Amino acid sequence: MSICSTVGAGLNLHSPANATNSTRLSSNFVHQIPVSSFSFSFQSSSLRLSQTPKFSRQRRNPIVVSSTPVVESTKSSFRAKNPKDTNILVVGSTGYIGNFVVKELVSRGFNVIAIAREKSGIKGRNSKEQASDQLKGANVCFSDVSHLDVLEKSLGDLDVPIDVVVSCLASRTGGIKDSWKIDYEATKNSLVAGRNRGASHFVLLSAICVQKPLLEFQRAKLKFEAELMEAAKEDSGFTYSIVRPTAFFKSLGGQVELVKDGKPYVMFGDGKLCACKPISEQDLASFIADCVLSEDKINQVLPIGGPGKALTPLEQGEILFRLLGKEPNFFKVPIGIMDFAIGVLDFLVKFFPAMEDAAEYGKIGRYYAAESMLILDPETGEYSADKTPSYGKDTLEDFFERVLSEGMAGQELGEQSVF
């Protein structure tokens, strides 16, 4: 028997024994499933930028799906269904992109089951009620994707089949343990649990930077991507779409308020070390939603950027100063400073292992300061703006203009902040 509660109404409703699946998942109610928390621990080794770390102490289990799914699979039929009869499980639903993906899927008429933590958002500051309001229109299931048994129990209590899983999970910090816990383990759990409930398609939000994996979160994402592809290879009735977006608008907006207040625009080197084709959260959410039904996106790795030309940090700063009507004022930081800092941190990690995440954060900052978020052409070994697909209509200039007038509300960087 499922228990639903209307948000803020203080009224509990018990669905009758003969309730249909669509009744149980009616968008008029929010399905709330409390779960207990468990401790989670990882062992990890120190990371060096110049070599691939070894994880010999940490045994990783391959993706295993029970031979007899809990519910009858809908492998050949979900794309022919009416959207309102298609159940889509979204994990990472309260994140920056996940929230927009839920809204987009709901707007297209899909029956969305959004998995959320009881304390979500940046540093867990959002309550269950706030999460439910944020995910309005979806059926919110409070669970813990980092523990497979907890997630499977939550889905079992819902007692409905799953057609598609959409994963928008991503490590908040990029730290070593957090990367493997979220980008690999939790994402794997969502695949296993979804397939055990009949899911026949998996849409993964990955990142374009995994093309050149020098960071721990990139390796974790690539490991899951490989296992996802292998799962589809072994089961012809199971498919995937791997979405690798370029930079998000919010990751480029951290200096808007500073420049508005008269501070210089900070960039590394000459401001031309890297470039990207940034994409808005709404455009990316639309592309991810397209992957649910579009057959031309089945079993594909899909790099995607926003509209317009690729922009270097120098060009991004010039756009910002033009919108403000100010003379450009740049502060150029030699990239060698970051290399020196990383070298010091790597040395300290040998004596103070607890500093390994600090060293990793330095490498993350260095990576984004020098590596382009564009297609890496295997023939030339160079990044190619021309080969990076564009999608959507929102431009970075539009975003900057909006932030200048409205602020960064809803675009907070949290632990991802650099400036």
Curated annotation (Swiss-Prot):
Temperature-related properties: Optimum temperature is 25 degrees Celsius with DV-Chlidea as substrate, Optimum temperature is 20 degrees Celsius with DV-Pchlidea or DV-MPE as substrate.
Any Gene Ontology biological process: chlorophyll biosynthetic process
Assigned EC number: 1.3.1.75
Keyword match Nucleotide-binding: no
Keywords: Chlorophyll biosynthesis, Chloroplast, NADP, Oxidoreductase, Plastid, Transit peptide
Xref: Gene3D superfamilies: NAD(P)-binding Rossmann-like Domain
Top-rank taxon: Eukaryota
Top-rank EC class of the record's enzyme: oxidoreductase
pH dependence: Optimum pH is 7.0 with DV-Chlidea or DV-Pchlidea as substrate, optimum pH is 6.5 with DV-MPE as substrate.
Pfam families, per the entry: NAD_binding_10 (PF13460)
Cleaved signal peptide residues: none
Location within or outside the cell: Plastid, Chloroplast
InterPro entries: DVR-like, NAD(P)-bd_dom, NAD(P)-bd_dom_sf
GO terms assigned for molecular function: 3,8-divinyl protochlorophyllide a 8-vinyl-reductase (NADPH) activity
Reaction catalyzed: protochlorophyllide a + NADP(+) = 3,8-divinyl protochlorophyllide a + NADPH + H(+)
Segment annotated as transit peptide: 1-71
GO cellular component entries: chloroplast
Pathway: Porphyrin-containing compound metabolism; chlorophyll biosynthesis
Keyword tRNA processing: no
Function: Catalyzes the conversion of divinyl chlorophyllide to monovinyl chlorophyllide. Reduces the 8-vinyl group of the tetrapyrrole to an ethyl group using NADPH as the reductant. The best substrate is (3,8-divinyl)-chlorophyllide a (DV-Chlidea). Very low activity with (3,8-divinyl)-protochlorophyllide a (DV-Pchlidea) and (3,8-divinyl)-magnesium-protoporphyrin IX monomethyl ester (DV-MPE). No activity with (3,8-divinyl)-magnesium-protoporphyrin IX (DV-Mg-Proto) and (3,8-divinyl)-chlorophyll a (DV-Chla).
UniProt name for this protein: Divinyl chlorophyllide a 8-vinyl-reductase, chloroplastic
Source organism of this protein record: Cucumis sativus
Upper lineage: Eukaryota, Viridiplantae, Streptophyta, Embryophyta, Tracheophyta
